[in-house]
Amino acid sequence: MTTPLAHEPSALALTVNGDPRSVAAGTTLSAFLASLKLDPRVVVVEHNREILRDREAYGSLELSAGDVLEIVHFVGGG
């Protein structure tokens, strides 16, 4: 087993839409959505069984090990 170096961010294990994912420690929800190329204006995020209604808070919400996210996309149509 290796220990991460002090200058390397630790990886955190998450579950996203039922699939295992990992992110660097300190990653915000906003940064995670950007890494997936998702526009926060067209998704709804459930974080640990709680729907996040305040999209402004995405930038300050740091993800933690064990977090469970469900991300739902809005799809237009007619």
Map each language-model feature to its residues:
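Ubiquitin-like/PB1-type beta-grasp interaction modules and other compact soluble beta-rich domains
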Residues: M1-G77
